[in-house]
């Protein structure tokens, strides 16, 4: 069977879910986008899909509290996960959506690639590293997208990319690092190619877990 040809420009919003129980069936292939609340995740999604209003951009970091699903082809989805690391959010709310993030990462079998977005000026903070380490341990390919690279000179941008590559090389995992700018479209073509390659894999059938398999202990822990 030939693989599905993917065009990110065909992405269409389908649902916002508070947890994985309300997501589409765990089949096909998903690529998830995760990052700190001010990493420019929504802007990156809009740029990659050439749709200015696909992902809502909030001026208040920490507003994205749901798992947002965008379908790019039949059984091929982009997943916008809740942002993490923003302090000015009520603790109860923070725990609720960080639990949703952790459950998704641990339980979603159709997840085949993870895009971790980091401000190029402040990459690899503790939660970023935790997320990338988890992906490496799970044999999940990662695209480390260093956003807002238009804020740096070409020389500084290159040195930051090299520094991140060096820091992640010890994980011996499938991790690619790319400078990215939603404003200047820097890195758009390269990121598009990587994400589409993930989505164009052959999908496998999975045995869905029973409802009792989900427990409250599965949580992506937020630092205080």
Curated annotation (Swiss-Prot):
Keyword set, alphabetical order: Cell cycle, Cell division, GTP-binding, Magnesium, Metal-binding, Nucleotide-binding, Septation
Residue positions binding Mg(2+): 42, 64
Cofactor needs: Mg(2+)
GO CC annotation terms, alphabetical: cytosol
Domain EngB-type G: start-end pairs: 27-201
Swiss-Prot/TrEMBL GO biological process terms: division septum assembly
Any single Pfam family the record assigns to this protein: MMR_HSR1
Keyword Cell division: yes
Region (Disordered): 205-224
One MF term in the entry's GO annotations: metal ion binding
InterPro entries: G_ENGB_dom, GTP-bd, GTP-bd_ribosome_bio_YsxC, P-loop_NTPase
PROSITE patterns (alphabetical): G_ENGB (PS51706)
Database matches in CDD domains: YihA_EngB (cd01876)
Amino acids binding GTP: 35-42, 62-66, 80-83, 147-150, 180-182
Function summary: Necessary for normal cell division and for the maintenance of normal septation.
Record family assignment: Belongs to the TRAFAC class TrmE-Era-EngA-EngB-Septin-like GTPase superfamily. EngB GTPase family.
Name of the molecule in the record: Probable GTP-binding protein EngB
Gene from which the chain derives: engB
């Amino acid at each position: 069977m030939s693989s599905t040809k993917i065009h990110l420009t065909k992405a269409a919003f389908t649902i916002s879910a508070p947890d994985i129980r309300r997501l589409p069936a765990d089949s096909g292939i998903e690529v998830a986008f995760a990052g700190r609340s001010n990493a420019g995740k929504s802007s990156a999604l809009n740029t990659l899909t050439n749709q200015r209003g696909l992902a809502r951009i909030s001026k208040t970091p920490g507003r994205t509290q749901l798992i947002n699903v965008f379908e790019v082809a039949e059984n091929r989805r982009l997943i916008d996960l809740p942002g993490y690391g923003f302090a000015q959010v009520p603790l109860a709310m923070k725990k609720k959506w960080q639990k949703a993030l952790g459950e998704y990462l641990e339980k979603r079998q159709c997840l085949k690639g993870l895009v971790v977005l980091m401000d190029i000026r402040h990459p690899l903070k503790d939660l970023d590293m935790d997320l990338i380490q988890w992906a490496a341990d799970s044999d999940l390919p990662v695209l480390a997208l260093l956003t807002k690279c238009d804020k740096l000179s070409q020389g500084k941008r290159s040195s930051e990319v090299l520094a991140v590559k060096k820091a992640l090389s010890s994980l011996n995992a499938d991790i690619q690092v790319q400078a990215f700018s939603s404003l200047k479209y820097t890195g758009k073509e390269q990121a598009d190619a990587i994400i589409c390659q993930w989505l164009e894999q052959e999908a496998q059938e999975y045995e869905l877990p029973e409802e009792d398999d989900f427990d409250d202990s599965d949580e992506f822990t937020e630092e205080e």
